[in-house]
């Protein structure tokens, strides 16, 4: 399944945030969206997920206009991890992750074996199986972040939309999230669009990078083509060095002035 934004313009009231944005993620492809604060990244995720209707342009899910699809079909197709944790605080971790199975269930009161299996797998993969019976309200921000990701994985959607999936996570769990998403893309052939702040993570995990600034796409291509000092410095307005890791061959990024 693919997802595509076609000349999207969007905003809030009279405040325009996105202007003529086009991008796409195909089956088996991870697209990272980078850009400074206020670039429109989270607004883009809201439009792609159907939470915000565009003022102009269309979002296509496998070639079909998202605005014309039933909510149930969208829920089965799109898994979303928003920027701010939206987990329900009155529930346990297991109950929240089970909510990811709702699009596949005829009744929330009827849990099937495949639902239990999907939830157990998501809990294990997100390293929160030991928290399954804990109340979400008792968890740290990083733990709640992993609950939100586990819910999206349990959903088994064909498209993942992630807004800063590694926010609030320590280094180990941030790497684990990258590995998990990469595995979903490669093993299940899903399409993924992920907003990232970590330039190094985009270089390591993504197939393509979209650079967003001022509500417009400034660059779109493989990491080695987009993660160039001249492009990044113009967008982020800080000194940036890019080098190639000798072992992996991947670019890595150093930001800010270096001094001894």
Can you name each region flagged by the protein language model?
Residues 110, 135-139, 143:
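Conserved ABC ATPase signature
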Residues 34-36:
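The feature captures the beta-strand-to-loop junction immediately N-terminal to the Walker
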Residues 57-65, 74:
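Conserved ABC transporter NBD signature motif
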Residues 98, 113-131, 156:
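Conserved ABC ATPase "signature" region
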Residues 160-164:
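Catalytic Walker B motif of ABC-type/P-loop ATPase nucleotide-binding domains
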Residues 1-5, 9-20, 27, 68-70, ...:
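A short, flexible loop at the N-terminus of ABC-type nucleotide-binding domains that lies
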Residues 49:
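Helix-to-loop junction immediately C-terminal to a conserved catalytic motif
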